Amino acid sequence: MNRLYIVFICLAALSSCEKVWEDDLQEKALDAVRGRYEIASAVWEGTEPIDIDGDGNASYDYYAEWNQVDVGWHPQHTVNNRLGRLDIPYTYCENDHWGGLVFLERRYERLEFDIEVVIEGGESRLEFTLPDEDSQLTLSGYGELTLRTDVTFTVIVSPEETREVTGPVLFKFKRIEYISGE
């Protein structure tokens, strides 16, 4: 009976160690993505180049096109001072998100997503929620994230004419600041 009791205590201790190990692994994985990021590049992956800044020159360089958009035609089209910055963790209004990317200060040009670290078989992976189910967010290097997702944005053709475009964009982010989890 004593041996069975000792085996039971050892199994209980061993199972609690595994939980601590998983928690530690999850915290390390979260720590690896925590921070403030800037866009290093954004590439339009559509079949044809796009011209979203209305200058007549189409390009696959989504970031360059996007940065040249004249948002001054209309008072509501103001560039947010956090243009192109990704924060993990991120809080906007009353919604808590593990990630948030601000394009322009307009409701429909804000991309917010939740990131969760999932532990399976001793390996961690990032899981996240975006409107586009085919989106992929990966930790591509130390302090580097890659996000491939469909983006819908408004093209201001003239003060009187706008159009919406949706298509795949590959974003690459570089961490510029660590955000502590404490």
Where are these regions (language model features)?
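Bacterial Sec-dependent N-terminal signal peptides
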Residues: 13-44, 173-182
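Short solvent-exposed strand/turn elements
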Residues: 60-71, 77
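Short, cysteine-centered beta-strand-loop-beta hairpins and adjacent loop/turn segments enriched
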Residues: 45-49, 93-101, 152-165
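Contiguous, well-ordered beta-strand patches that form the walls/edges
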Residues: 45, 71-146, 174-176
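Sec-dependent bacterial lipoprotein signal peptides
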Residues: 1-17
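Acidic, glycine-anchored loop motifs typical of Ca2+
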Residues: 50-64
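Edge beta-strand at a domain terminus
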Residues: 143-182
